[in-house]
């Protein structure tokens, strides 16, 4: 088939996806995915993208799963609320994060299928977070303790997000606890977290110094050429990639027919230039998407990214980032270790 693809929260801009006359677009095959979702007014792109990557990885293996972001959001908010309570309101509740945080929460709390706990379409996570903080401040003033706090939180979450599923979930006739289901979705050590910066030695792991790395996840540091090779190899062998990077660039805010490029002044993209962008704070950890394919346009490589801003954005929820854009603006990538062998 011929493919024309046109802050973390949903942006209302619409991307035109008409291929310019005279452009040569090479045919491509996209990795199979679950339906595009819409994170709405929430900063949960990291959860949507990492779950989407896991879902596509399972589809590739002949297994179909569709996972609940709402469950993770609820578990995270409850945990953050307890931290807020014990800090006497000095530790703010933030729902931002990085892709590996999703794995952290799955390992800790398990996961449930999307059908067991769906996203409510009209919920505003920013408003819910403020309600949680208000509830916690009252709890601090009253010194009610954790059990009563959790009881009040659960009533709030039930009202705003819907009632939690039973302690066991059912999938293809089998019965699982959320923890057991999580082990079937993402076993420990299944994914590798990768980055590429020169202020730490290559070949070593370090906690990325980004504000959203709340759980201090560590990433394997590799040269950018090697990171790009890992991404290409994964995609060419049918494995999705969870991409995390900067979308504040002019090329992303105003893509040309759904294709995103760096500015001519930013070429060539090198290890040194991406380090300068990061250290000058021009490359920031803005957004997370799932890479599901590669495409060649006028003999230049682009990576097809599945977003979480609904299927009315871009080309049915997708956009193409150039290889130079990835080289310059990637913060991190999460890839199945099977794809790295």
Where are the regions a protein language model picked out?
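Phosphate-handling active-site elements
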Residues: 57-69
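Sec-exported extracytoplasmic/periplasmic mature domains
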Residues: 50-59, 107-111, 236
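Active-site signature of cysteine proteases
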Residues: 11, 29, 151-341
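Second-shell loop/turn segments in exported
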Residues: 31-43, 86-94, 214-221, 230-231, ...
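Active-site-adjacent bridging/hinge elements
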Residues: 18-29, 76
């Amino acid at each position: 088939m011929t493919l024309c693809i046109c802050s973390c929260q949903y942006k209302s801009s619409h991307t035109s996806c008409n291929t310019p006359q005279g452009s040569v677009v090479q045919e491509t095959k996209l990795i199979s995915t679950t339906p595009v979702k819409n994170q709405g007014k929430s900063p949960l792109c990291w959860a949507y993208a990492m779950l989407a990557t896991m879902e596509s990885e399972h589809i590739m293996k002949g297994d179909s799963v569709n996972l609940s972001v709402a469950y993770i959001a609820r578990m995270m908010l409850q945990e953050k609320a307890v931290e807020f309570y014990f800090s006497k309101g000095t530790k703010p509740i933030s729902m931002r994060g990085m892709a590996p945080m999703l794995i952290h929460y799955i390992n800790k709390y398990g996961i449930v299928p999307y059908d067991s706990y769906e996203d409510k379409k009209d919920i505003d996570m920013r408003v819910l977070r403020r309600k949680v903080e208000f509830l916690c401040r009252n709890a601090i003033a009253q010194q009610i303790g954790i059990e009563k706090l959790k009881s009040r939180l659960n009533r709030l979450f039930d009202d705003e997000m819907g009632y939690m599923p039973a302690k066991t979930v059912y999938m293809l006739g089998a019965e699982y606890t959320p923890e057991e289901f999580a082990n079937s979705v993402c076993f420990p050590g299944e994914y590798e977290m990768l980055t590429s910066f020169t202020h730490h030695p290559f070949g070593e792991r370090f906690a990325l110094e980004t504000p959203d790395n709340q759980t201090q996840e560590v990433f394997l540091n590799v040269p950018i050429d090697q990171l790009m090779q890992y991404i290409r190899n994964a995609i060419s062998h049918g494995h999705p990639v969870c991409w995390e990077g900067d979308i504040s660039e002019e090329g992303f805010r105003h893509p040309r027919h759904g294709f995103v490029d760096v500015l001519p002044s930013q070429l060539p993209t090198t290890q040194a230039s991406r380090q300068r962008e990061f250290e000058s704070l021009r490359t920031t950890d803005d957004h997370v998407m799932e890479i599901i394919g590669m495409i060649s346009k006028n003999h230049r490589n682009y990576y097809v990214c599945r977003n979480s801003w609904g299927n009315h954005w871009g080309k049915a929820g997708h956009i193409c980032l150039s290889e130079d854009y990835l080289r310059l603006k990637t913060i991190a990538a999460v890839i199945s270790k099977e794809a790295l062998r």
